[in-house]
């Protein structure tokens, strides 16, 4: 390799940035040092050594010699999967590992491309072998559902203009513009866009990052604000053909945004191969490849969140645990975005009004600290940048209108020009203006913060006054009917604009959270801040758009308040869920608010909660909650408790010594339960430590002045949101594997201790052997113990006990911003990823199999859906203050009409909520349909499924995730 890079000019030039050489050293060794080498790239020369120098930038430590051979043969995406499976581990800067993988791909690109093609062909062949003869009509079933719609009579007090709130007379075919946008969404391959990262890097190269042009340390807020303004002033203003909204997140029709100060360099190794990978391939132009490799990534290779913590805290244990992927995954390495902003403020005041508010705050506070003055100045600069982008778009709209030959489109562009000259700089007055202002604000926020979980919030509440004002101006029924149709189309354009970008996911991410988009949650219904029914006209218009488009993002969540909201509304939620197969997610207002009681939030703030990212509650515009700061694999603690602190996959004696099963150290079940909670507490303590370090990193590397300007109290406190400026602060964890842990603990308690039918050492031997040679024991543990979801009060008690420990252990900590930690029980798709990294369990679950999603019971817990419903609803809401994901796969009876199916779904959801259940999401698909989609993905490109908190297109998921969905319990209704 060294010789090739030294002698081939085409490779030698890859060792340069735009103005210097890329100097770094990569070490390679096995755990037992049977192999030890390094390669250095310095001053344009590559050199191999027979040892690893102490100053190596990154060292890859392989499990054995075979992994070294695999490393050199596999394409970059598969190399990262070796890391995920703990076949090798890293010490040092991950950016340089990815740069080295990029160099390998340049050297072996042709071979790797052939390997990827071979891998794809093998997958197709496997599907063909596994598929059986299925009903050809399966592929058309979803289309048929869209043809069946029911009407309703308005009973909701907040609905003023819709005689039929279900809007049953409208279908997608009534909106050719949306049909066109949807086709682009479903057929266009995403492309990596370098615009944002390139412009920001240009500014920092010119003006400095750590110090300014005069050598003085930068105030991070001012540095970020000035770079942001430069970005917004220089972005390409784009208005897509036929769109009613202006502006784009990237320069591509569907663009992948690069955030190099967080996780952007994780794609470095795939700059050549990203277009050929089997899952979620990305287009990447030669210009983008060159820009990222020669300019962007070199600048940020040591200026990102992981590397700031590594250098500041000497690669702490908490960080090393995260980088093994098996026990927890820290989202703050990629984002601090899970929050909801005060969009009503932007609509009410505009950027100009908010700037005036900032000036008034500074004038009123004569003793303002330097921090406050700098923070508020940074907010103003960012708001000016957003307004500048809107002005550029207005000029573009005017130019497009002048060149447009079609009179109807010219009129739309002229109207858009007027709108952009008004908002977001000033207050919005019409629905057109409000949606454009929100969209432009949304673009602006994603130019500052990672597009992962940043959520829109209660958009029906914000838009209703504008819709009502527009309708009040109309005199005839015909005018109002036409305007309702336009409102549907406008909202449809907004939904489709939200699909114009995707998060940057290296191939390893396809296994951790495959199929996920940006998870931009919107929330409908519920109650108002003063406690009244919040369902309104826009609630139903948004539900109509959700129904006809059936797209994965925005992630639609619906609040249902049993005391205030109508059955008509809940039935509509169920009908939309039936037609789309997977959305919206439904939440019990009373249970969610009960879960948050411990924090003493003001009632008006609590009633204004909305879902964030997946399902997590945030108090809209007042709460920096980072509700998905981490994914915690609770099952890892069980494995460590069974192995005296040793983690089997990592082969690491990392946890505290809590006792040996073989030595008979656990005389009682309580002894073992104590060992489990000690290990889980150890993992929680470490995850919190690393999360707090990353929080500090964000405050230094990427404070967020624009976001802070739309977050209550940041202005008054004079403190950025990353430093605790928001009115309410917290951090939320997702605890994964509750049902699997509960079932395993029930097996241990019942069979080992209560009934003494098996010895603990015997059970452990069977678990260690993946139950091979222990069929009788496997049958015993899977059939003779009451499971969570079976209707067993004892199993529910065990689940509550585990959930309470997680809640209390997280709740004992405070985050970097001074707020509490919350605990939720949902999993995105990490129940699959963590499952593949986990051995067999006492419950009988075999090694490598997925955990149950969220806190959904194990598929064989009960053949009766009501048992599942009762057990999940029996969990104590106080322990679930970051919400849950209860996934149910239901299959309508072929003999039932559309109306009857909706009634059945309504009955189950209503019963669950009446019992106190917090959240429910349904996949209304058959196992046969999913199997057919695996075999014939071309027939199911828009088949929507609910994973655990978010939606995905089934055909974009990795095989393990598809099988997990297929293997979920299927209940007839």
Regions found by a protein language model. Name each.
Residues 397-413:
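Short, Lys/Glu-rich amphipathic helical modules
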Residues 420:
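Cofactor-pocket helix-loop regions in the catalytic cores of large enzyme subunits
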Residues 1-145:
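Feature captures hydrophobic
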Residues 73, 85, 403-405, 472-473, ...:
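Charged, alpha-helical scaffolding/interaction elements associated with membrane systems
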Residues 145-375, 408, 412-415, 426, ...:
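Conserved catalytic cores of very large enzyme subunits
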Residues 377-388:
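Extended non-globular scaffold/tether segments
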């Amino acid at each position: 390799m060294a010789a090739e890079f030294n002698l081939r000019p085409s490779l030698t030039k890859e060792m340069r940035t735009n103005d210097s050489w890329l100097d770094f050293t990569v070490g390679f060794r096995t755990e037992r040092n049977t192999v030890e080498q390094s390669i250095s790239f310095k001053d344009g020369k590559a050199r191999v050594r027979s040892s690893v120098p102490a100053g190596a930038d990154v060292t890859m430590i392989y499990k054995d010699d075979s992994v070294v051979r695999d490393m050199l043969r596999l394409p970059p995406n598969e190399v990262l999967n070796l890391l995920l499976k703990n076949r090798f581990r890293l010490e040092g800067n991950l950016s340089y590992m990815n740069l080295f993988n990029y160099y390998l791909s340049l050297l072996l690109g042709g071979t790797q491309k052939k390997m990827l093609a071979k891998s794809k062909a093998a997958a197709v062949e496997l599907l063909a072998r596994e598929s059986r003869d299925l009903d050809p009509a399966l592929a058309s079933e979803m289309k048929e559902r869209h043809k069946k719609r029911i009407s309703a009579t308005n009973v909701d007090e907040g609905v003023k203009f819709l005689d039929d709130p279900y809007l049953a007379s409208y279908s997608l075919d009534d909106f050719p513009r949306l049909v066109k946008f949807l086709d682009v969404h479903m057929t266009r391959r995403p492309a990596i866009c370098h615009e944002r990262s390139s412009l920001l890097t240009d500014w920092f190269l010119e003006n400095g990052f750590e110090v300014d042009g005069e050598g003085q340390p930068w105030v991070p807020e001012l540095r970020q604000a000035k770079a942001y303004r430069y970005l917004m002033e220089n972005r390409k203003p784009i208005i897509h053909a036929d769109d009613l909204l202006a502006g784009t997140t990237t320069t591509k029709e569907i663009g992948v945004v690069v955030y190099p100060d967080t996780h952007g360099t994780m794609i470095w190794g795939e700059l050549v191969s990203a277009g050929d990978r089997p899952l979620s391939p990305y287009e990447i132009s030669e210009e983008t490849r060159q820009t990222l490799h020669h300019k962007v990534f070199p600048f940020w290779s040591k200026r990102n969140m992981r590397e700031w913590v590594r250098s500041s805290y000497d690669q702490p244990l908490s960080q090393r645990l995260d980088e093994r992927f098996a026990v927890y995954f820290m989202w703050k390495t990629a984002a601090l975005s899970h929050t909801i902003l005060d969009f009503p403020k932007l609509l009410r005041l505009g950027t100009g009004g908010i700037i005036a508010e900032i000036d008034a705050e500074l004038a009123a506070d004569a003793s303002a600290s330097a921090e406050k003055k700098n923070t508020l100045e940074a907010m103003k600069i960012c708001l000016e940048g957003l307004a500048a982008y809107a002005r550029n778009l207005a000029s573009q709209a005017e130019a497009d209108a002048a060149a447009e030959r079609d009179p109807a489109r010219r009129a739309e562009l002229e109207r858009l020009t007027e709108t952009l000259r008004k908002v977001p700089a000033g207050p919005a007055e019409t629905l057109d203006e409000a949606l454009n202002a929100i969209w432009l604000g949304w673009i602006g926020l994603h130019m500052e913060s990672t597009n992962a979980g940043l959520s829109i919030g209660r958009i029906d509440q914000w838009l209703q006054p504008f819709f009502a004002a527009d309708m009040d101006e109309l005199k005839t029924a015909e005018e109002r009917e036409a305007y309702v149709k336009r409102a549907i189309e406008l909202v449809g354009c907004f939904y489709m604009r939200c699909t114009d970008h995707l998060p940057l996911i290296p191939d390893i991410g396809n296994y951790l959270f495959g199929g996920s988009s940006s998870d931009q949650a919107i929330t409908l219904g519920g109650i108002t801040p003063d406690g009244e029914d919040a369902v309104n006209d826009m609630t139903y218009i948004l539900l109509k758009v959700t129904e006809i488009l059936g797209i994965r993002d925005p992630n639609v969540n619906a609040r249902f308040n049993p005391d205030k909201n109508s059955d008509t509304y809940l039935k509509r939620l169920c009908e939309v869920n039936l037609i789309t197969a997977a959305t919206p997610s439904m939440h019990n207002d009373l249970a969610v608010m009960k879960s948050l009681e411990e924090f003493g939030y003001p009632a008006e703030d609590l009633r204004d909660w909305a879902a964030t990212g997946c399902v997590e509650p945030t108090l809209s515009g007042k709460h920096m909650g980072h509700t998905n700061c981490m994914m915690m694999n609770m099952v890892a603690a069980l494995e460590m408790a069974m192995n005296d602190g040793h983690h089997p996959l990592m082969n690491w004696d990392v946890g505290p010594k809590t006792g040996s099963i073989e030595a008979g150290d656990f005389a009682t079940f309580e002894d073992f339960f104590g060992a489990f909670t000690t290990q889980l507490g150890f993992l929680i303590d470490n995850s919190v430590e690393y999360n707090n370090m990353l929080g500090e990193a964000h405050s230094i590397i990427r404070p967020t002045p624009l976001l802070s300007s739309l977050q209550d109290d940041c202005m008054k406190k004079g403190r950025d949101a990353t430093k605790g400026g928001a009115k309410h602060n917290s951090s939320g964890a997702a605890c994964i594997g509750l049902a699997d842990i509960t079932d395993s603990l029930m097996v241990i308690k019942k069979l080992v201790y209560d009934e003494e039918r098996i010895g603990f050492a015997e059970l452990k031997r069977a678990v260690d052997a993946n139950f091979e040679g222990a069929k009788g024991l496997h049958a015993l543990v899977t059939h003779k113990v009451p499971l969570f979801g079976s209707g067993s009060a004892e199993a529910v008690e065990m689940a509550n006990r585990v959930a309470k420990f997680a809640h209390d252990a997280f709740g004992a900590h405070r985050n970097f911003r001074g707020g509490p930690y919350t605990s939720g029980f949902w999993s995105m798709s990490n129940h699959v990823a963590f499952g593949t990294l986990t051995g067999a369990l006492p419950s009988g679950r075999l090694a490598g199999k997925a955990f149950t999603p969220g806190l959904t019971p194990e598929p064989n817990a009960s053949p009766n859906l009501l048992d599942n419903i009762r057990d999940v609803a029996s969990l104590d809401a106080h322990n679930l203050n970051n919400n849950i994901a209860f996934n149910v796969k239901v299959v309508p009876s072929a003999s039932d009409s559309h109306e009857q199916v909706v009634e059945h779904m309504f009955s189950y959801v209503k019963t669950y909520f009446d019992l106190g259940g917090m959240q429910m999401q349904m996949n209304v698909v058959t196992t046969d349909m999913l199997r057919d989609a695996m075999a014939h993905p071309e027939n199911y490109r828009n088949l929507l499924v609910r994973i655990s908190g978010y939606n995905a297109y089934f055909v974009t998921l990795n095989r393990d995730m598809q099988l997990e969905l297929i293997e979920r319990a299927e209940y007839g209704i």
